[in-house]
Amino acid sequence: MNSFYPSRKLGQNFTVDQSVIAKTCRLIKSLNPTALIEVGPGKGALTKALLKLQLPYHGIELDKRLAEYLLVNEILTEEQLTIGDALKQNLDQYFPDTIPLLCGNIPYSISSPLIANFLASKLQQFVLVCQWEFGQRLVAPVNSPNYSAFGVFCQYHLQIKSVFKIDKVAFKPKPQVDSVLMLLKKKPQVAYEAHFGRFLKQCFHQRRKLLVNNLKQLLPPTLLTNVLQQQDLAATVRAQELTPTQLFRLYLSLKPHLSDGKD
């Protein structure tokens, strides 16, 4: 595969720094997984290190050229590889008798939907390399410029840790921005609420607007004002001023009044 050209459309930037690969594997090993699912094994740099952990493994690769490379070079067997889109896969199908750890170097374009797919599955831990800016949005505090609907959604459901920053020179081709290794763990006793995410999108639709105004297409303003008052929140509050817990409590109070009990 000497003539292989990475796909810009697929956001392919392969990890070439062995120290980054080693640190990633050490983190994964410390989490004591029983099996591994890797999204985007690419040319197998991280894959080879993961296989040395001697755990049940399955990779999901969208690029047929890379899938062929992995098979021809006997990095993976056909049983260890799914050729397809990770966003369209049921992540629970690969190891029905155990709960695997999800990992991978994730293109920016699929970072959010892949986390959503992870949240909807039975999987509990996700170790991912993503763009630095995206990682910052995941951990952004209340009332900060990066505080967003998706960040709130993730913070409510997950324990999120930014493990270490990765310089762009660790990848080939070199991306324009740095990356970060993130660790996502599902919070115990927190049930997945998909409709909460859609509710949050409306809450943050226009950041400068009051929450009442952002939600007026879904609910009568008087109803929303009354619910805010019941929760000791001002009628002039904006979504970015509320914690994930406050926003979820608000969602639960308003849920019966949303269409079909949803948003």
UniProtKB/Swiss-Prot annotation:
Catalytic activity: adenosine(1518)/adenosine(1519) in 16S rRNA + 4 S-adenosyl-L-methionine = N(6)-dimethyladenosine(1518)/N(6)-dimethyladenosine(1519) in 16S rRNA + 4 S-adenosyl-L-homocysteine + 4 H(+)
One term of GO molecular function: RNA binding
Pfam families on file: RrnaAD
Superkingdom of the organism of origin: Bacteria
Record-listed E.C. numbers: 2.1.1.182
Keyword list, A-Z: Cytoplasm, Methyltransferase, RNA-binding, rRNA processing, S-adenosyl-L-methionine, Transferase
Cellular compartment(s): Cytoplasm
Major localization listed first in the record, in broad terms: cytoplasm
Name of the featured protein: Ribosomal RNA small subunit methyltransferase A
Organism: Mycoplasma pneumoniae (strain ATCC 29342 / M129 / Subtype 1)
